[in-house]
Amino acid sequence: METLCPPPRLAVPASPRGSPCSPTPLKPRRGTPEFSPLCLRALAFCALAKPRPSSLGLGPGELAPRTPVLLGPPASPCTGGWAADGLKHLGGQAGRPSDVSSPAREDADVAVCPGGGEEEEGGGGFPHFGAGSCAPPGRCPAPLRPQDSPTNPAWSPPRPARGLDAASSPPLEPGSPPPSPPAGLSPEPAPSEQPVPASEAPGGGDPAPTAPEAPALSPSTADAAPDPPRDLRQEHFNRLIRRSKLWCYAKGFALDTPSLRRGPERPAAKARGAAKKRRRPAPPPPSVQPRRPVPTLPTSSTFSLLDCFPCPPALVVEENGDLGPASSLRLQGDAKPPPAHPLWKWQMGGPAVPEPPGLKSWWVNLEEL
């Protein structure tokens, strides 16, 4: 059996399986270690699972996360020990069987941190100040006095918001008195909010004088009101656009006038009307032109057949159908045609085109012979 079992390989020591977050031990590399995708995903999950900072460190646009009723946030310096004590009281209420439902827990949570709901509705603000807090945003309210501690019988637990009582708070027992608001807050509304009834008004029953209403703005005062600040860059951009070539081509070069450069104090409607008037000038009055005289028709025709020929014809057909000299058409009586007339050079049997002078007399000689 000893010969069949292979001996253990001691050359390569067995290394424990590394965690996914450890760098790969295959090749020792210089520089920053490389992490596997699983390790990076685990790191991202751990970063997301970290608790968010307290509501005091939130930016103006962040929403304060709702804290569970039983756990509660750590007491911040601006809220003192009131938030933790209120959470204990609400936790005791939540411990009753079928007494507080899940919406009621959320409402109680909102009552503990009333600023969180306001921040979620309004977006941003100071979540650690409630609606009834009179301290300005820059200061923290004073911590509770010893007589305001929960052990004091005069101390009462915090009261949820009014709008949430009727909606989702559990019905109160018939024998228990209604819970009072936290110390420092009176159950009655502020005197400025509560109107004084006519029966309790001082001065023998006369109603209290109300504040005079602001007089309505007259048209003159409305006109005299200061104009909203104008954007000089936008005006300059509009002026450049209206002076550009494309705008001028589109509008017919009528808007690039001194009236536009005068400034925006001129009403836009008047400037537009003036531009339209300049763009469409009135047509000039029609000038009275003398009419041309009606052309009179000639009594005799001016057409001449012989004038249309490039050269006077030599022979024409006479009335008897025979050929005759063309000069006979213009001759009056027994007059002879002029010596340049082709009649003198034309002979029977001769060529139609005149010959050169050297060959001119050969046919005459033939006739004589």
Swiss-Prot record:
Listed GO MF terms: chromatin binding; protein-containing complex binding
Superkingdom field: Eukaryota
Keyword set includes Iron-sulfur: no
Biased composition annotated in UniProt, kind: Basic and acidic residues: 228-237
Region spans: Interaction with SUZ12: 301-349
Phosphoserine: residues bearing it: S15, S19
Biased composition regions of type Low complexity, renumbered to the chain: 207-225
Subcellular location: Nucleus; Chromosome
Region (Disordered): 1-33, 89-237, 256-299
Residue span of region BC-box: 39-48
Keywords from the UniProt entry: Chromatin regulator, Chromosome, Methylation, Nucleus, Phosphoprotein
GO cellular component: chromosome; nucleus
Annotated InterPro entries: ElonginBC-PRC2_ViralRestrict, EPOP
Organs and tissues of expression: Highly expressed in embryonic stem cells (ESCs) during embryogenesis and in the adult brain.
Listed GO biological process terms: neuron fate commitment; regulation of transcription by RNA polymerase II; stem cell differentiation; transcription elongation-coupled chromatin remodeling
Predominant place of localization: nucleus
Start-end of Pro residues biased regions: 1-10, 171-194, 282-296
Modified residues (Asymmetric dimethylarginine): R52
Purpose: Scaffold protein that serves as a bridging partner between the PRC2/EZH2 complex and the elongin BC complex: required to fine-tune the transcriptional status of Polycomb group (PcG) target genes in embryonic stem cells (ESCs). Plays a key role in genomic regions that display both active and repressive chromatin properties in pluripotent stem cells by sustaining low level expression at PcG target genes: acts by recruiting the elongin BC complex, thereby restricting excessive activity of the PRC2/EZH2 complex. Interaction with USP7 promotes deubiquitination of H2B at promoter sites.
Entry comment, domain topic: The BC-box, which mediates binding to the elongin BC complex.
Subunit record text: Associates with the PRC2 complex, which consists of the core components EED, EZH1 or EZH2, SUZ12, and RBBP4, and various combinations of accessory subunits including AEBP2, JARID2, PHF19, MTF2 and EPOP. Within the complex, interacts with SUZ12 (via C2H2 zinc finger domain); competes with JARID2 for SUZ12 binding. Associates with the elongin BC complex. Interacts with USP7.
Protein name: Elongin BC and Polycomb repressive complex 2-associated protein
Species whose genome carries this gene: Mus musculus
Gene: Epop
